[in-house]
Amino acid sequence: MAGFIIIGFGNIVNRDKIVAVVSPDAAPVKRMVQQGKEEKIVIDATQGRRTKAVLVTQEGFLVLSALQPDTIGKRLHAEKIIEEKGDLDE
């Protein structure tokens, strides 16, 4: 079952397609985002705000979010727990 998480400002992504959630402050991540912009594989979901997290998808897309990586990680974890509890109830 595909689950979605909110990554801020009404934007949602498929939880099952997220490979990593990283901080954009490290130099390698900055290079990855810059290269991704040149290759047109970056999806900017910040609504003009500062990028605080970069989500890497299975398909190689980079999704920029204005939420902290910790916040997104907690949402990913919470969704997984809810889904597992739902499976147990059936």
Language-model features, listed with the residues they occupy:
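Short, charged/polar surface micro-motifs in flexible loops or helix N-caps
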Residues: 12, 24-29, 38, 59-61, ...
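Short aromatic-glycine motifs in intrinsically disordered, low-complexity regions
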Residues: 1-12
